[in-house]
């Protein structure tokens, strides 16, 4: 074995985004504003749902968990990206890289499972309105949330442990803005066939199957409403399914295209842009799409503000 191959990598260099140096400050301000918008929007949702008893329903239980997941998902990558954009040496320790990978996978998987739970909730609400409260009991809702958190732990840990067993020799430059699976596998000088097989198999379980379940749920919603077509029914389809499906398509579409159907023609820049879509853009848009345009959330915000105002005056 050569001396080069015996070198142990203690840190990686995150090359970040291919942004010209003269535009760094502009993009730094843009990404900082996007991150702050994500944090503020999701925090507002979590706080409102906690404070307003009218929002203590299955739908908003899932939504509060989704908002927390979005907040954490974005926080796994964005602070490090912002730090590296201001640093001369954008490095990350090997242990820090594995930690970032674990939490990135954890919250990505959690979002996937929570989106399924939300789709099922809407399916029951529209197709079985008279039995909604009996089907979506508090016990079932809490069980779905807890199951989502537990399943993601095992999946994220599996990929992280498989990555930790690999050897990294001379090259330590990651052409990405965070420690993602694909660029790390390309840097490894070990056999990565097991990792790639697990990505394909487990990806089908935590990405493809949830995506199919969401599509099936909404297909049955549409079929149920079309049996008795009406303007109100069609409006319900668009108001209930449209926003959710747009985010689902953005989230799952980029992940499936990036990890499960990779193209040999995919450039590093293209992969980075796709990663930005679901790590930065989607968590930022979710509060606006799911809640801040929602009448219940607006009314809850008014009630909370009025209550605080009265308390302050007293």
UniProtKB/Swiss-Prot annotation:
Q: Which family does it belong to?
A: Belongs to the G-protein coupled receptor 1 family.
Its keywords, alphabetically, are: Cell membrane, Disulfide bond, G-protein coupled receptor, Glycoprotein, Membrane, Olfaction, Receptor, Sensory transduction, Transducer, Transmembrane, Transmembrane helix
Tissues where the protein occurs: Olfactory epithelium.
Location in the cell reads:
Cell membrane
State which residue ranges cross the membrane.
26-49, 58-79, 101-120, 140-158, 197-219, 237-260, 273-292
Describe its function: Odorant receptor.
Q: Which organism is it from?
A: Rattus norvegicus
Glycosylated residues (UniProt): 5
Please give the name of this protein: Olfactory receptor 1468
Q: Between which residues do disulfide bridges form? A: 97-189
| Name of the encoding gene | Olr1468
Which ranges of this chain reside in the Extracellular compartment per its record? 1-25, 80-100, 159-196, 261-272
Q: Which InterPro entries match?
A: GPCR_Rhodpsn, GPCR_Rhodpsn_7TM, Olfact_rcpt
One of its GO biological process terms is:
signal transduction
Cytoplasmic topology: which positions?
Answer: 50-57, 121-139, 220-236, 293-314
């Amino acid at each position: 074995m050569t001396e080069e191959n015996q070198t142990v990598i203690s840190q990686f260099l995150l090359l970040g985004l291919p942004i010209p140096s003269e535009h760094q400050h502009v993009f730094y301000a843009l990404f900082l504003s996007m991150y702050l918008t994500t944090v503020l929007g999701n925090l507002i949702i979590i706080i409102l749902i906690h404070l307003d008893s009218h929002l203590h329903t299955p739908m908003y239980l899932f939504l509060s968990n989704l908002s927390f997941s979005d907040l954490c998902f974005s926080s796994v990558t964005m602070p490090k990206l912002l730090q590296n954009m201001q640093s001369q040496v954008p490095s990350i320790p090997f242990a820090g890289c594995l930690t970032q990978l674990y939490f990135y996978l954890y919250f990505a998987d959690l979002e996937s499972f929570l989106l399924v739970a939300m789709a099922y909730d809407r399916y029951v609400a529209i197709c079985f309105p008279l039995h909604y409260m009996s089907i979506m009991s508090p016990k079932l809702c809490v069980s779905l949330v807890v199951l989502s958190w537990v399943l993601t732990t095992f999946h994220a840990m599996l990929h992280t442990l498989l990555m930790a067993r690999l050897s990294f020799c001379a090259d330590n430059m990651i052409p990405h803005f965070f420690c993602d699976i694909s660029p790390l596998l390309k840097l490894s000088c070990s056999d990565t066939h097991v990792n790639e097989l697990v990505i394909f198999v487990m990806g089908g379980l935590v990405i493809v199957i949830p995506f199919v379940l969401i599509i099936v749920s909404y297909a049955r919603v549409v079929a149920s409403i079309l049996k008795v077509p009406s303007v109100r029914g069609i409006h319900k389809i668009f108001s209930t399914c449209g926003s959710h499906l747009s985010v689902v398509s953005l989230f799952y579409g980029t992940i499936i295209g990036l990890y499960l159907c990779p193209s040999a023609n995919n450039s590093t820049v293209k992969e980075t842009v796709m990663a930005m879509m679901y790590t930065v853009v989607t968590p930022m848009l979710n509060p606006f799409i799911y809640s801040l345009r929602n009448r219940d959330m607006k009314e809850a915000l008014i009630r909370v503000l009025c209550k605080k105002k009265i308390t302050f005056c007293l």
